[in-house]
C-alpha cells in the first residue's frame, strides 16, 4: 500500500478481536476491520475499545484498514 493510494479516516474502536485485530466505527458510520501497524506494535501502544484512532484504508478494499495512530484522550 503506497502513500498515494490510501485514505486516512478517524474512528472509534468498538471491539477488540484476536491477533491484534479491531473493529472500528468510522466517523461516517461505516464499520471496518483494522489491524495495528508494525510501528505501534513495536512501541507497545495499547488499544482498548473506546479509543479514538486514525485508520488508513486502501482504495481497493474499503472494508479493511490499518490503525496508524491513537489519539490522546481529551
From Swiss-Prot:
Quaternary context: Component of the 30S ribosomal translation pre-initiation complex which assembles on the 30S ribosome in the order IF-2 and IF-3, IF-1 and N-formylmethionyl-tRNA(fMet); mRNA recruitment can occur at any time during PIC assembly.
A Pfam family reported for this protein in Swiss-Prot or TrEMBL: eIF-1a
Keywords assigned by UniProt, alphabetized: Cytoplasm, Initiation factor, Protein biosynthesis, RNA-binding, rRNA-binding
GO molecular function: ribosome binding; rRNA binding; translation initiation factor activity
Main location per the UniProt record: cytoplasm
Lineage of source species: Bacteria, Thermotogati, Thermotogota, Thermotogae, Thermotogales
Gene Ontology CC terms: cytosol
Name of the protein in its database record: Translation initiation factor IF-1
InterPro entries: NA-bd_OB-fold, RNA-binding_domain_S1_IF1, S1_domain, TIF_IF1
PANTHER family, per database record: TRANSLATION INITIATION FACTOR IF-1, CHLOROPLASTIC (PTHR33370:SF1)
